[in-house]
A protein has these predicted regions:
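Beta-lactam-recognizing serine transpeptidase/beta-lactamase-like catalytic domain environment
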Residues: 1-64, 69-301
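Soluble, non-transmembrane domains of envelope/secretory-pathway proteins that act on or interact
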Residues: 208-432
Length: 432
């Protein structure tokens, strides 16, 4: 046993991978015997890593959750109207590099809204062409990328050197920045900026609590909201809400929606450096209710512990589970009719109140997160088949077939998959 408030208790380290005194992770698992052999430098390197708050101290490439920011910048500076259409053929060339969309076969013609819903890299890069480097960098600063948020927690990371500037941003860097790759940010930077996109454009300094009270309940300090700036106009904010609502109803974020509620948001999948390792950060950034955002939520999964990492479902599932508990607790009432599956899932098939009928969006393939459609459980299961094998077969069952080759098409990368072996016979994704 150990006191969670005692940040220097070595027993908190039991079971984690040991770091050396320079903070590099080793393969050794910490036991009491290992703790007994640690010198002070190694011990404190491990304790500091254990209590580090990922949300404010760790940086990462945010990936496609940055796409609403790009669209908002284009709308706000007048380079986009929202009525544009773009053709995605699977890739574009910038600065001598071929940069791919998540769907190498291309998404075809897309509106601005559809580009956000399908998370199309190629469409976003074309928007970046219209926005231009100078405008993009102006809004990068408005969104507080590269700057501290000054949240009232210790250890917020400095990111000034982790974003591009006018001297370092070329056409390839601008292209990849439009979909959240090539620069680093913290979670608190991203969610604070996103809140401004969906609350009418108002950027507030983030705080952990709204007041401090004594043990007898006396208020010691009130922490009032502090408005710092306006990032976008109310009209731009309304459009971003509309686009992000579509991500959940029609696009890549369907699995984030809690039963009975309408929400909005954006999925993210970013390939980590070095790219050849195929490690990913997957995420979902969202809000509720969909028509009048009051709650923001952001889930980031750093290198999911699974064979196939580039699946936003790992993050959308977290968001769905959290909001399923949080929204009723905060007295938000269901607004959407429950399907039979949702009634069963909530364990309230006999108790759920039937709401006025609304049109439920049909299930569709997740263009970014390789969303796996739910299937009815069969009465018989093959005992020798592992859970990972079952999940992989279910995922393959959702893939479309290439009419020319007969191979399956992986929706995230456009790679061709041999249905007999499950192995790729084509290239793999560049970034998403």
């Amino acid at each position: 046993d150990f006191d969670l408030n005692d940040t220097k208790n070595p027993k908190a380290l039991l079971g984690m991978n040991k770091l050396d005194k320079d903070g590099k992770e080793t393969e050794e698992i910490i036991t009491q015997e290992v703790i007994d052999t640690m010198d002070d430098d190694t011990l404190y390197a491990n304790l500091n890593a254990l209590w580090k708050n990922f949300c404010i101290t760790s940086t990462y490439e945010p990936g496609s959750v940055a796409k609403p920011f790009t669209v908002a910048a284009g709308l706000e500076c007048g380079r986009l109207t929202g009525d544009e259409t773009y053709f995605c053929g699977g890739s574009l060339w910038y600065g001598g590099h071929e940069i791919h969309c998540h769907n190498r076969l291309g998404d075809g013609m897309l509106t601005v809204k559809e580009a956000v819903e399908k998370s199309c890299n190629v469409a976003l890069m074309q928007m970046g062409d219209a926005i231009g480097k100078d405008n993009f960098l102006t809004f990068q600063e408005l969104y507080n990328w590269g700057l501290k948020t000054n949240i009232d927690l210790a250890g917020e990371a400095r990111t000034a050197g982790l974003v591009y500037n006018s001297a370092t941003m070329g056409e390839a860097e601008l292209a990849t920045s439009t979909f959240g790759q090539g620069f680093n940010a913290t979670m608190i930077q991203m969610i604070a900026g996103f809140c401004s996109l969906v609350n009418g454009g108002y950027y507030y300094e983030p705080h952990v609590v709204n007041k401090i009270v004594s043990s007898d309940g006396t208020t010691i300090k009130n922490i009032e909201p502090r408005l710092l700036k306006q990032t976008v106009s109310a009209s731009t904010s309304e459009k971003i809400i509309d686009y992000c609502n579509g991500v959940v109803t029609e696009g890549t974020g369907k699995t984030a929606r809690p039963a009975g509620y309408a929400i909005g948001g954006k999925t993210g999948t970013a390939e980590m450096v070095p790219r050849n390792k195929k490690n990913y950060v997957v995420s979902f950034m969202g809000y509720a209710p969909a028509d009048h955002p009051e709650i923001a939520i952001y889930a980031v999964v750093d290198r999911p512990n699974t064979l196939i990492q580039d699946d936003a479902k790992f993050a959308t599932g977290i968001v769905k589970n959290v909001l399923t508990e949080v929204l009723p607790y905060l007295n938000y009432f269901m607004t959407e009719e429950l399907s039979d599956n949702e009634r069963t899932e909530l364990g309230e098939s006999d108790l759920a109140v039937k709401l006025p009928e609304v049109e439920n969006p049909e299930d569709a393939e997740d263009a970014e997160g390789a969303e796996v459609q739910q299937e009815e459980t069969t009465q018989e299961e093959t005992p020798q088949e592992s859970e990972e094998e079952k999940a992989w077969k279910e995922r393959l069952a959702t893939y479309e077939t290439d009419p020319e080759t007969g191979y399956l098409i992986e929706p995230e990368t456009g790679a061709l998959i041999d249905p007999a072996t499950g192995q790729a016979v084509d290239g793999s994704s560049f970034m998403n």
